[in-house]
Amino acid sequence: MSAQKETLGFQTEVKQLLKLMIHSLYSNKEIFLRELISNASDAADKLRFEGLAKPELFENDPELKIRIAFDKDARTITIADNGIGMSRDEVVSHIGTIAKSGTKSFFEQLSGDEKKDAHLIGQFGVGFYSAFIVADKVTLTTRRAGEAEAVRWESHGEGEYTLESVEKAERGTEIVLHLKEGEDELLNDWKLKGIIRKYSDHISIPIEMKKGNSYGENGEVIVSDEMEAVNSASALWTRSKNDISEEQYQEFYKHVAHDFTAPLAWSHARVEGRQEYTELLYIPSRAPFDLYDRERKQGVKLYVRRVFIMEDTEKLMPHYLRFVRGVIDSNDLPLNVSREILQESKDIDAIRAGCVKKVLGLLEDLSANQPEKYAEFWKEFGQVLKEGVGEDFANKERIAKLLRFVSTASEDAEPTVSLADYIGRMKEGQDKIYYITADTLAAAKNSPHLEVFKKKGVEVLLLTDRVDEWVTGSLFEFDGKALQSVAKGALDLGALEDEADKEAQKQVEEASKPVVEKVQKALGDKVKEVRATARLVESPACLVAGEHDMSAHLERMLKAAGQKIEGSKPTLEINPEHVLVKRLAEESDEARAGDLAAVLYDQALLAEGGKLEDPASFVKRINKLMLELSV
């Protein structure tokens, strides 16, 4: 076997990550051992899975374990496993590069704030690189199960690493950390065992260390090379809830989610009946940096009778719950289950439906009993949960109850208003839930469409998330009350208007016919129609979409996304009581009337967040009218 050594350079992103990580995570340096043990555990899971089809991969060594050792004289710590191991190509792809979607987004989000960056780095999954927090040289020797050749990887964590082919009798991976100056406290039996019990007690295979020295009856030191398991070595989710501490639940979450922060909440249950399975599902406290990446994988691991099968399968959790982390362990699925089988499996459908109910129940409990925690959840994951209104018809009503919004009754910009809250505050005679969609909260609050609602003291929901158009396109009513956009269709306040209001509006419409016709003629085919309205109090005009047309806000979003759409023409509603409209009605000069009508239209377009087709002409008209007024 050739032992020729090859020197290669790290991918640029790896160099950046190493530098950032060593600086940002040093205050929590103990996590290096958790991360390396977690990787070793994953390698054991992969061997178990591949060994189902190829038992020969176990090479007559079926007892999977992780071993930790230290050498005070050499100042090294060794982490060894007999899991699946890696081939030469796998070493290069897993360690020399970061082959992750969202890498660019990750680096863009780094702020320079040490605490925030540490959280982001933790989310990204530092894994193997965490070794360089405490080591100035790392030597990794690995042989993939079933292969003859082993490979040794070595680096000082700077710009380069070396690779060479070596001999290795046992399959699996051995990592030797050559500690930096000042890290000698880690070369201690008690210290390492404490770290293992703190962070990795839940790992389902034994993590072994030497028993350590003991003392005889006469005080003599008895040196023992016997190995002992430091951890409990049982799958945490198989234990009774009463036997698991809150800290153990949190540490297991950090292992399974590769997250540094404690979870917000979790659900642990054993389900019996037609399907028998155990679920341990977590709601994270922070959103990952790539939450909105549609290609991002899901975060729930599937086990069958405690044998890891796969992760990141959308069949286990719907896309709108992609933030959920945890494990599902089935007693009934076959061990040789594949992604193809999952696509057709009614058993998996039943498990998924049950787990979705558990997660929604967990969120319902938070919203009812821990509103402050639920507010934290909503801030991080609210926009994603909203996707479920359109994706999950069976649970639409449950999801709708969990939605939170800002409204005209809100004291600040925090979305705390539920649809049930809104209905509880509805005016006598009100039969609709009114809302407006806009690009920003300021644009929504100051929209001319709200003026009559403010006048009558009617609450309006202010929807500014991009996903809100999807929500209102799927949720047509809640608790028997229709959802109605205040910027679409003719104004219908129902019983909120008395007969006197309706009669007065009829008279205004009749009296306004000449000015309506004048504006219609001036604007031509720019608008579907012009009409007098009672929805305006302070503004001269506003644009309204047809009842069944796409909203102007959605139109803008689709165009910004590069979609070619034929937008429908809006209706221009004018306020006959406004001084500008009265001035236009009195204007006898056709050209000036045309300028005034065009300005009314452009102002209405700007007020709803639209973009002028010809800004220069708008400026000229405004300048011209201002000069005439100053004469």
Curated annotation (Swiss-Prot):
Region (C): 557-631
Annotated stretches, region: B: 340-556
Xref: PANTHER family: HEAT SHOCK PROTEIN 90 FAMILY MEMBER
Keyword Nucleotide-binding (UniProt): yes
Gene Ontology cellular-component annotations: cytoplasm
Organism listed in the record: Chromobacterium violaceum (strain ATCC 12472 / DSM 30191 / JCM 1249 / CCUG 213 / NBRC 12614 / NCIMB 9131 / NCTC 9757 / MK)
Pfam family name, one: HATPase_c_3
Record localization: Cytoplasm
Residue ranges of the region described as A: 1-339
Protein name, entry field: Chaperone protein HtpG
